[in-house]
């Protein structure tokens, strides 16, 4: 197996905010395609049922078209699979947004799920920074380690090059994680929208 290889492609311009990345390491082989301006359609196979469900939920609530295929070292644990999908999905977002001309840039959403609530605040800033508060109420959800939801968000943030603050509260880890993925999706959907009043990059520096 190749130690670490990656290939990527992006759409032709601002009207085609898409990306495709293939990445292979000694631990995972991943293929991701993303359309930011999609319909919420998803085809996901990571080998972790709950994680597949969360990625499908992410696509549905963010109205992103998403395919994720991952063959990871699940005989060890779920860490590399979840982490590396976060890395590749983050890179895909960054690539698909290109120069980020006309985007809203800032957004925040709180999403409840029964007793749980998650809040995500994002700045598509070009400056990767991640903050997280809260803890998950149970350590495991099926074959998914609950705290890997936090690590997924961290990996996504660092490689999409955004600033992201997230928090969760609740008493059921399934609800907490699902609320987090929905909140992340809704926030990114809003932050990546194109503002018809703006044709340039939303920064006094002129770039993000």
From Swiss-Prot:
**InterPro entries to which the protein is assigned, alphabetical:** IGPD_sf, ImidazoleglycerolP_deHydtase, ImidazoleglycerP_deHydtase_CS, Ribosomal_Su5_D2-typ_SF
Location(s) in or outside the cell: Cytoplasm
- EC class, as a word, reads lyase
Pathway where it operates: Amino-acid biosynthesis; L-histidine biosynthesis; L-histidine from 5-phospho-alpha-D-ribose 1-diphosphate: step 6/9
Keyword Chloroplast belongs to the record = no
Keywords from the named record? Amino-acid biosynthesis, Cytoplasm, Histidine biosynthesis, Lyase
Cellular component GO terms, alphabetical: cytoplasm
Q: Which CDD domains does the record associate with it? A: IGPD
Catalysed reaction, written as an equation: D-erythro-1-(imidazol-4-yl)glycerol 3-phosphate = 3-(imidazol-4-yl)-2-oxopropyl phosphate + H2O
Native organism is Haloquadratum walsbyi (strain DSM 16790 / HBSQ001)
GO terms (BP aspect): L-histidine biosynthetic process
Give the enzyme's EC designation: 4.2.1.19
HAMAP family, A to Z: HisB (MF_00076)
PANTHER family cross-referenced by the UniProt entry: IMIDAZOLEGLYCEROL-PHOSPHATE DEHYDRATASE, IMIDAZOLEGLYCEROL-PHOSPHATE DEHYDRATASE HIS7
Record carries keyword Ribosomal protein: no
A GO term, aspect molecular function: imidazoleglycerol-phosphate dehydratase activity
Annotated Pfam families? IGPD
- The record's principal subcellular location, in a coarse class, is cytoplasm
Q: What is this protein called?
A: Imidazoleglycerol-phosphate dehydratase
The highest taxon in the source lineage is Archaea
Q: Which family does it belong to?
A: Belongs to the imidazoleglycerol-phosphate dehydratase family.
Region Disordered, annotated ranges: 1-22
């Amino acid at each position: 197996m190749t130690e670490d290889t990656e290939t990527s492609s992006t759409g032709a311009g601002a009207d085609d905010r898409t990306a495709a990345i293939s990445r292979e390491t000694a631990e995972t082989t991943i293929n991701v395609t993303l359309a930011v301006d999609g319909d919420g359609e998803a085809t996901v196979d990571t080998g972790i049922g709950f994680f597949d469900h969360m990625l499908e939920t992410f696509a549905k609530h963010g109205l992103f078209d998403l395919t994720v295929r991952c063959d990871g070292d699940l005989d060890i644990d779920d860490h590399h699979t979840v982490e590396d999908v976060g890395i590749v999905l983050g890179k895909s977002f960054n690539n698909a947004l290109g120069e980020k001309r006309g985007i809203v840039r800032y957004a925040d959403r709180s999403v409840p799920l029964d007793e749980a609530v998650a809040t995500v605040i994002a700045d598509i800033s070009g400056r990767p920074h991640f903050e997280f508060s809260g803890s998950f109420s149970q350590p495991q959800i099926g074959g998914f380690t609950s705290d890997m939801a936090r690590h997924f968000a961290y990996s996504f943030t660092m490689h999409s090059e955004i600033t992201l603050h997230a928090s969760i509260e609740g008493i059921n880890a399934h609800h907490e994680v699902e609320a987090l993925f929905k909140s992340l999706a809704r926030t990114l959907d809003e932050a990546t929208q194109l503002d018809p009043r703006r044709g340039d990059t939303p920064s006094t520096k002129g770039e993000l």
